[in-house]
Amino acid sequence: MDVPQYADVPHLGQVVPALLGALGVPGEDGGLALPEARSACVLLIDGLGWELLAQHASDAPVLTELASSPLRVGFPSTTAAGVAAIGTGLASGEHGMVGYTFEVPGNGVLNALRWRSHDDGSDLRGALPPREVQPLPTTFERAAAAGIEAAVVSSAHFANTALTQATQSGARYAGVHALGDLAARTLEVLSSRAFCYAYHSELDLLGHVYGPGSTAWRMQLRHVDRLVESIVDGLPAGAVLAVVADHGMVTVEEKLNLEDSPELLAGVRAFGGEVRARHVYTEPGATEDVVAAWRSVLGSRAWVLPREEAIEAGWFGASVSDRVRPRIGDVVAAATGTFGMVRELAEAVETNLVGQHGSLTSAEQLVPLAIARG
């Protein structure tokens, strides 16, 4: 069963280096050939897949017209990895946010969005300082070092989160509360020589709760399109806007509860990842047997590889640092089709979500790249 290949599609991590290069920052070039700019912004619409946009083009005519080509987000196709790609210009094998949850040796399994233990909910900021988990220079720090103002325009609720600290250090944070001030603050930043990252989360939320393509999701997509139109209409001369996403989404129709599957628990000491993309951490010497068991039980419902094979296949990017390697499961399982690997007791909330993402399918991997110029 062949894993889909996207090598000829630009990576999400290339977008910000390309924008910084357009702003004249030395050494920055994402290979996207953007024109010289006075100010630039990347607007990330959480959960907006390329295929979803194509399927619902009538709900988003502005985005559809601007989005002439897709990006690939890399593995796993999840928010922590996508936000880190924006914040570093790198793939997960280098920035280290290898999942919604992943093991950090000596500290158990970290929930990267909440920065808490995925096992007992304890706060891990003290044990795992954000800038130690992700120590690489951020794109915002690189912009600021070149004398360009760097700003983040996002929900005020995210202003002091650990993930923000790990991936957006060096930026001035402009906390907003709704679509109106998201557009207004973005245009305010773009009025001077600056780089801006703006973020909208609610499309992803409604996709999880009601399903991607549901009526609620489509109504939100219409609001997103109006947001983009409002920013595009107000772009000052010399400004460039790039609208992207961190992942697509699928509706999960078949679930397997790992907690009720003894053959999938044998030799396993911990789980990371999420419903569509699992890190499986094994007992010493058990990896080969775990791979065999998971392949036997899951069959064509998932791609199952031992860590080194997943790395060699490029799942986590062209290179994986020694710092990041132990965070990747001894075994990695990526769901195909509309299948999900749930943990009904340990992850009750996640189990009951309608829409899911994380895997390697084109519905999850491909996102729009929409470019507008003032």
Model-identified regions with their sequence ranges:
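Feature captures the catalytic ectodomains and active-site-proximal regions of enzymes
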Residues: 1-374
